[in-house]
């Protein structure tokens, strides 16, 4: 892959194109119909118990729309149950029996993924996850749009 002239966005997409298929294949190897994007939802529900979509989106750092789409897929695939909340417009999500049964295999795979990430970190000489967290924090303090406006045009 020749990324000599790639810019930040292209490099970030290329990185995800390297990571996501490998993780998806690991789940297929376990005979699980599971997507990496389900992980933050499952982990949050494991930690907090049943949640409204709004609260889950906030906890996962996703937009309400993105979380709603992911949750719909997870309900369809049998990973979550959705119930109507106190307000008939809100849905309360909780882990399904399928999710609870698969947790040991998923947790083992999450640990393997973390070990693989540490191997990458060792090759890089720094934690990629920490670099990404730091970048997101910096952008939270001063968004990229502001940085673009502050950069002189030549």
What are these regions (language model features)?
Residues 1, 123-154:
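C-terminal regulatory/oligomerization modules of transcriptional regulators
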Residues 53, 71-72:
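Short, hydrophobic-biased segments on the C-terminal half of alpha helices
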Residues 21-63:
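N-terminal helix-turn-helix DNA-binding core of bacterial DNA-binding proteins
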Residues 1-32, 139:
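N-terminal leader segment of winged-helix/HTH proteins
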């Amino acid at each position: 892959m020749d990324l000599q002239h790639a810019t930040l966005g292209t490099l970030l997409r290329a990185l995800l194109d390297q990571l996501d298929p490998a993780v998806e294949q690991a789940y297929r190897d376990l005979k699980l119909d599971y997507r990496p994007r389900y992980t933050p939802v499952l982990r949050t529900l494991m930690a907090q118990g049943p949640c409204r979509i709004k609260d889950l989106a906030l906890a996962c750092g996703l937009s309400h729309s993105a979380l709603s789409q992911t949750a719909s897929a997870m309900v369809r695939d049998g990973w979550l149950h959705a119930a109507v909340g106190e307000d008939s417009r809100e849905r309360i999500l909780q882990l399904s029996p399928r999710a609870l049964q698969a947790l040991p295999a998923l947790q083992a795979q999450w640990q393997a993924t973390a070990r693989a990430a540490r191997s990458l970190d060792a090759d890089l000489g720094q934690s990629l996850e920490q670099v990404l967290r730091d970048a997101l924090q910096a952008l939270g303090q001063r968004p990229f749009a502001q940085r673009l406006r502050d950069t002189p045009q030549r």
